[in-house]
């Protein structure tokens, strides 16, 4: 089984010395995925800039869960959008690919690691777990409506719902398929299911902020425990809250990438 290693902010990963045959940073492509209601210029911007300054090839696309897009596309579409980002990095010379996500982006990165071969997936303060009880209660009526519409062949029909983001919420409307994909406990973003389906040999780094809400800490830990035994998994703690976790994780992510 996997080895669990808890470290603190700005410390090096245990045993993460750079192997003699490790690729140069400019041969590692990194897709950085922002969190819910975020954007590439939000909480993940500093991390993306730090990785670029260390020589990594980095792209940070705006994803369907951004504040502007409001879940305009579902899971299959966001996988395709990450595919496009990977193609861009490959064209620039990337030989290895890692997906680094924050919050909702972390859960999406985990999903991507079940759908495509990647060298690594880093999950920073993973959030947006549709299988958690709070989400089940909040989104159940919208999920039921969306399921009925999709069953009628109306996947693009809009569904209204109250969207949760920590202690904040917004009233939104999104296509039925998107509502199912993001909020159905049995849908494609169930992090427990995806953890068990990560492709063998994929490096998975879980970054847990010490000031995270208790419920999210428990969900992240449970997700980590369900990772496929063949995944190369590791954990790091950073001294930060949920939104500041990407900045606090800069050193840990940089060192982990160098060890791919």
Predicted feature residues:
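Serine-hydrolase catalytic core
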Residues: 165-249
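Short beta-strand element of the alpha/beta-hydrolase
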Residues: 27-35
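The serine-hydrolase catalytic nucleophile loop
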Residues: 37-47, 218-219
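Gly/Ala-rich beta-loop-alpha elbow adjacent to hydrolase catalytic centers
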Residues: 100-109
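Conserved alpha/beta-hydrolase
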Residues: 51-68
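Accessory cap/linker subdomain of secreted extracellular hydrolases
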Residues: 124-194
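Alpha/beta-hydrolase active-site loop
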Residues: 72-92
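Residue in the alpha/beta-hydrolase core beta-strand immediately N-terminal to the catalytic nucleophile
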Residues: 98, 120-122
């Amino acid at each position: 089984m996997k080895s669990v290693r808890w470290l603190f902010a700005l410390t090096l990963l245990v045993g993460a010395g750079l192997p003699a045959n490790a690729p140069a940073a400019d041969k590692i492509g990194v897709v950085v995925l922002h969190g819910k209601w975020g954007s590439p210029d939000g909480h993940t911007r500093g991390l993306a800039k730090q990785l670029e300054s260390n020589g990594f090839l980095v792209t940070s696309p705006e994803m369907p869960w951004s504040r502007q897009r409001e879940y305009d596309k579902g899971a299959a579409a966001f996988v395709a959008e990450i595919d496009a980002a990977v193609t861009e990095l490959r064209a620039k010379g990337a030989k290895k690919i890692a997906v680094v996500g924050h919050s909702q982006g972390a859960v999406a990165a985990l999903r991507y690691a079940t759908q495509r071969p990647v060298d690594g997936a880093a999950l920073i303060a993973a959030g947006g777990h549709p299988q958690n009880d709070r989400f089940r209660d909040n989104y159940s009526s919208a999920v039921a409506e969306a399921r009925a519409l999709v069953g009628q062949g109306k996947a693009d029909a809009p569904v209204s719902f109250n969207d949760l983001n920590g202690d904040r919420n917004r009233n939104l409307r999104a296509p039925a398929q998107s509502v199912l994909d993001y909020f159905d406990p049995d849908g494609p973003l169930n992090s427990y299911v995806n953890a068990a389906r990560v492709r063998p040999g994929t490096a998975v780094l879980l970054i847990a902020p010490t000031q995270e809400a208790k419920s999210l800490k428990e969900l992240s830990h449970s997700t980590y425990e369900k990772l496929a035994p063949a995944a190369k998994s590791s954990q790091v703690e950073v001294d930060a809250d949920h939104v500041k976790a990407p900045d606090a994780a800069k050193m840990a992510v940089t060192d982990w990438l160098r060890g791919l």
